[in-house]
């Protein structure tokens, strides 16, 4: 979607002054995330028969970096601690693994993990709340609607249009997305504004038409059946929550938006692709070659009278190359020689590894996040040289994500109580329990917990729960059975054999 063209349309028709130039930078980050930047990955080759194009091979490291950050920050071991039991059950379900409740219906954890990846390539991510099946009065005020359904959208920066920003916090925003209406492309715009304690969510649709200039044109479309143009709620928190990588932006423009986690590592990403492409080309062109004289070959003539030489081995034709006939007497033997190009694997490996180390360092993952030694990948839990850098950066990046998570959960609880008439408490305490296995591996943690349990520093049921994935009740039962068995053995052996 051409977001810049749509922003220009909104600026003209609504009197806004949204900076469209910043979205060109977001588009450049998107290209790197997808692994194809035309100015970098298109190679022109000039031959005797004209110009040819070749696409440079890419490791697509920007996407891998964003995936790794998402897996570190928001994964299956991330949990919520909610003070009110009814609110916790409503959101998370009644089991200790937090695999039920509304968040399961919304596929929250899977989508939130993907949103972190999207936010880290685009610079900003947004959780956006909406409620379907609402009842509204003639003025558009939302009324209690037990039949309503809470929904969440997950938008990257290219879909976020900040309208009001106060002290670096986006208080009003619009969210744009592509859709299809009547089989034709369209744009859906949802605008969140606040005035005097009232929040208004406005829904608009626009038709997209092609123009001879190549720039799309937009026209206001009718509201689809079953949809309202706007709703108003009073006393609600913001129905959206934004977060960005925890770095200070050194790029002008885009107020309210962050910058990509790899925006300062584009040169390193380019170096990685250059090194990898060179490695690949050396392997592709490094096959055995045999140069021979045409006089060594059988000849055949096609229907046009053109003579062709049959190479010594037609099956492996690609290794044979013709040489000009040798000068001298006709009795001189035919010339041929074998050539085995140097693949330069060590040099190429070192170049790729250096580029990966620079990329890892510039993206805050430490110096050796991606280390290939003896054919084995050494991950973050297998090296200690720069783990401290990763720990510090991960702790810093948890802060904005935690703020966004708590903000959207409070908005969900508010809508559940005031609109869906659910028995929940929007003001309950909420905290996030982060997975810190990137600091200490699960095996190391379990081994340490076992030693502490044997030393009597922690209850043995705590170790059993961590080691075997038991619930608290099951762990207590196992510990009691183990204690009873040990006492029985002592009684049986009391007094000797």
Predicted feature descriptions by range:
Residues 1-171, 494-497:
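Extended, helix-rich architectural segments
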Residues 115-116, 129-130, 283-291, 369-374, ...:
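Short coil/turn segments at secondary-structure boundaries
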Residues 27, 44, 50, 132, ...:
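Charge-rich, acidic-biased intrinsically disordered regions
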Residues 223-385:
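Extended, charged amphipathic alpha-helical segments
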Residues 448-497:
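Activation/maturation switch segments at domain boundaries
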């Amino acid at each position: 979607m051409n977001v810049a063209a749509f922003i220009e349309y909104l600026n003209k028709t609504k009197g806004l002054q949204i900076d469209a130039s910043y979205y060109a930078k977001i588009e450049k980050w998107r290209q790197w995330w997808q692994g194809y930047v035309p100015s970098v990955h298109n190679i022109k080759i000039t031959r005797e028969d004209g110009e040819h194009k070749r696409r440079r091979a890419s490791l697509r490291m920007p996407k891998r970096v964003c995936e790794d950050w998402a897996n570190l920050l928001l994964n299956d071991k991330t949990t919520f601690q909610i003070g009110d039991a009814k609110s916790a059950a409503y959101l998370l379900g009644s089991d200790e693994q937090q695999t039920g409740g509304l968040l399961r219906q919304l596929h929250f954890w899977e989508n939130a993990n993907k949103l972190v990846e999207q936010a880290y390539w685009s610079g900003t991510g947004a959780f956006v709340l909406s409620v379907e099946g609402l009842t509204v009065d003639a003025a558009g005020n939302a009324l209690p609607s037990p039949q309503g359904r809470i929904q969440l959208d997950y938008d990257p920066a290219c879909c976020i249009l900040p309208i009001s920003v106060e002290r670096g916090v986006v208080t009003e925003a619009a969210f744009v997305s592509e859709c299809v209406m009547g089989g034709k492309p369209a744009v859906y715009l949802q605008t969140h504004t606040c005035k005097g304690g009232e929040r208004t969510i406005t829904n608009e649709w626009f038709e997209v038409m092609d123009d001879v200039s190549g720039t799309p044109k937009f026209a206001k479309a009718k509201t689809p059946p079953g949809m309202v143009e706007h709703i108003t709620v009073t006393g609600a928190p913001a129905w959206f929550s934004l977060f960005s990588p925890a770095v200070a932006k050194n790029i002008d423009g885009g107020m309210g938006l962050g910058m990509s986690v790899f925006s300062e590592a584009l040169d390193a990403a380019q170096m990685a692709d250059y090194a990898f492409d060179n490695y690949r080309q050396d392997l592709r062109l490094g096959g055995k070659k045999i140069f021979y004289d045409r006089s060594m070959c059988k000849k055949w003539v096609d229907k046009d009278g053109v003579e062709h030489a049959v190479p010594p081995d037609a099956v492996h034709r690609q290794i044979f190359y013709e040489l000009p006939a040798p000068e001298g007497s006709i009795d001189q033997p035919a010339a041929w020689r074998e050539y085995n190009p140097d693949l330069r694997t060590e040099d190429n490996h070192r170049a790729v590894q250096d580029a990966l180390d620079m990329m890892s360092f510039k993206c805050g993952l430490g110096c050796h996040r991606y280390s290939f030694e003896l054919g084995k990948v050494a991950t973050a839990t297998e090296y200690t040289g720069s783990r401290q850098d990763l720990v510090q950066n991960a702790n810093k990046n948890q802060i904005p994500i935690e703020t966004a998570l708590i903000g959207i959960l409070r908005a969900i609880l508010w809508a559940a109580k005031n609109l869906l008439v659910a028995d929940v408490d929007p003001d309950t305490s909420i905290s996030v329990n982060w997975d810190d296995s990137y600091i200490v591996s699960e095996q190391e943690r379990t081994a340490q917990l076992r030693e502490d349990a044997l030393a009597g520093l922690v209850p043995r049921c705590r170790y059993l729960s961590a080691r075997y994935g038991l619930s608290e009740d099951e762990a207590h039962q196992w510990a009691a059975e183990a204690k009873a068995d040990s006492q029985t053995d002592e009684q049986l052996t009391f007094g000797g054999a």
